[in-house]
């Protein structure tokens, strides 16, 4: 399957909307079947955009490329930082970010989501996470053990100076759960305080990186994953007791 992960630089809102149309259709013309945009890619943290206008744009773009599944991650809607999944002019899944990033004041802007989300597309079960969620292995674990996901998609707004942490966490979630992980990060922002973003990263179920020349275009064979070393579902042992032994 051909996948496109945007390397998006957030600029003026109107220009962002124009570029969204252009990039989405250009990716479709190259044969991409699955296209991901990063967190807050249309507005950044400080600007706003009418949610209905955003939905209209997403409907227009996904109608113009009906063979593509779009993960638009994310927009500000209903007091949530929301990842939206669109196809053929319709939204059929969304996920509200659970683990808000307090150092950026996200808890003052949005309310946390109340559920983890996975959806089925073709023969895949796909779990959604958003940026800071990747720090919490329990979420990825639930998407693997309970939802039986094959793939995690993680839009993000990580800074370049912490790219090593971002990539390490993505790799860990892939290896420990034996699933594919796609991390699509903002490349930069020039409209607010100038910001350099981290990279895009893809890891296979063995935790091995999938490299490309541009960090945008990937060819992944979901039907032939690497052999499992440990089955994280069948071999999981649930323990509900933690012993604390005193040294006295």
Stretches found by the model and what they are:
Residues 1-12, 125-133, 153:
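Active-site-proximal beta-strand elements of phosphoester/diester hydrolases
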Residues 8, 40, 133-134, 157-158, ...:
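Active-site metal-binding loops of divalent metal-dependent hydrolases
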Residues 11-17, 21-94, 160-172, 179:
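Cys-nucleophile CN-hydrolase/nitrilase-fold catalytic domain and related Cys-dependent amidase chemistry
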Residues 43, 84, 95-101, 212-219:
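Short beta->alpha transition motifs characteristic of CBS
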Residues 57-69, 139-217:
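CN hydrolase (nitrilase-like) catalytic-core segments centered on the catalytic cysteine
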Residues 70-72, 94-105, 181-186:
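Short Pro/Gly-enriched beta-strand edge/turn motifs at strand-loop
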Residues 77-150, 159-168, 224-238, 245:
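Active-site catalytic loop in hydrolytic enzyme cores
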Residues 118-120, 186-248:
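C-terminal beta-strand edge segments of enzyme domains
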């Amino acid at each position: 399957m051909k996948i496109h992960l945007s390397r998006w630089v957030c600029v003026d809102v109107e220009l962002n909307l124009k570029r969204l149309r252009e990039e989405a259709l250009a990716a479709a013309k190259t044969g991409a079947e699955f296209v991901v945009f990063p967190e807050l890619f249309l507005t950044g943290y400080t600007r706003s955009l009418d949610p209905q206008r955003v939905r209209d744009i997403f409907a227009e773009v996904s109608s113009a490329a009906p063979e593509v599944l779009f993960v638009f991650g994310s927009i500000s809607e209903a007091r949530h930082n929301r990842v939206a999944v669109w196809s053929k002019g319709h939204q059929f899944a969304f996920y509200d970010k659970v683990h808000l990033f307090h150092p950026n004041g996200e808890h003052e802007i949005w309310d946390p989501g109340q559920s983890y989300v996975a959806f089925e597309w073709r023969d895949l079960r796909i779990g959604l996470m958003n940026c800071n969620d990747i720090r919490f292995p329990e979420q990825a674990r639930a998407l693997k053990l309970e939802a039986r996901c094959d793939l995690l998609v993680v839009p993000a707004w990580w800074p370049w100076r912490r790219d090593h942490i971002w990539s390490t966490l993505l790799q860990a979630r892939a290896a420990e759960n034996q699933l594919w992980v796609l991390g699509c990060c903002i490349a930069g922002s020039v409209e607010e305080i100038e910001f350099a973003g981290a990279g895009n990263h893809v890891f296979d179920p063995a935790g091995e990186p999938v490299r490309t020349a541009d960090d945008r275009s990937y060819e992944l064979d979901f039907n032939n994953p690497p052999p499992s070393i440990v089955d994280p579902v069948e071999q999981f042992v649930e323990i509900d007791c933690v012993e604390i032994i005193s040294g006295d």
